[in-house]
Amino acid sequence: MDNGTTVISMLENDLYKFSMSYYYQRTTPEGIGTFSFTDRNGQKFTQEFVDLLKSEFRKLSTLALTEEEFRWCHDNIYFIPQCYFEWLMGFRFNPDIIQISLDDEGHLHIEATDLIYKVTLYEIPILSTVSEVYYRTYEKTEPDWAFIDSQLEKKVALSNENKLKFANFGMRRRYSHEVEDHVTEYLTRHAKYFIGSSTVYFAMKYQSIRPDLKPIGTMAHELMMATAAFMGPKEANYYVMRHWAEIYGGNMGTMLPDCFTTRVFLRNFSLDMAKLYDGVRHDSGDPFEFGDKIIAKYESYHIDPMTKSIVFSDALDFDRALAIQKYFEGRIKVSFGIGTNLTNDVGTVKPLNIVMKLKTFQVNPRQHVYRCVKLSDTPGKELGDPDEVHSYKVILGLI
């Protein structure tokens, strides 16, 4: 780790950020997006903290994709064409587009605006930097490495004993780069059913130990949010499914259903898409109810659910994951994306509850700027202007 820098590689980002960036290049190359930070716990910060953040964000501009990383991406992220990684070699983060401020009560506000295929790459580095700088500044405690290893030993034992397949989804709210590195190495060496990491850098780093280790991920809510902003929410899910399939040809075939509620998604989940996609990801609401609905949908199309999969990724720990696996055993294939419980279970602090979501989208500079909305299967996880949220619910027949 270089002088406490929070992010040390252009590939220290979630895989789906690169896949979505290329999707935007293909579908809305002139689209302009604004991502906005939300602290769900309403933490209060100081100007000193803001100044430290600005210093860290300036360091992002020094990152560049190396020749070695380019070759690895070409060989391992084969579903994104070489031309994208050639573009990425020339891409640099621009700290000037990251606007940071405190309101009168000390709440933190961060926004970033640019062409959407560029600005989507900012979200995860910003979140992980806020998290790491927070622990350095306010907690000023070192991770309890003995505690971390003790927790990992229990989690790995549970996974190995129950053949529980999981990936690390934990960069955004991690304690630090150092902790995620340590956790990933431990899992790589000891967890038989650890299948990979959403953080591309660590998948690359530890593939030398485990050649089967993979970068993991598909898409995020922002795709449906951006699409709905310019064409309305009724068919946004189907539009994304169709265009994603055209671009990736069946690769990265896990759909995210809950952006406008799973109830709405199931209306859009046509027979052809149900057959084409490998499965879906659960990210809000009751996981057992969700899985039952997905299985019922497949069965209504006479598709054997055991040929499909669900990736569960909503605030999981290993005990919860095991309960889900047992419930769906023999009914549908399952795997798990576990984040904060891996990368911020350090024995000394509580994880922050922070997100950064698409606030507005403009399909090109000549068009209107639309406000974006995310609904959810969990009450209270909705994001967007309250009037716009209400409008979406009316349009979608949810109220």
Feature locations, PLM:
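Glycine-rich phosphate/ribose-binding loops and adjacent secondary-structure elements
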Residues: 2, 206-399
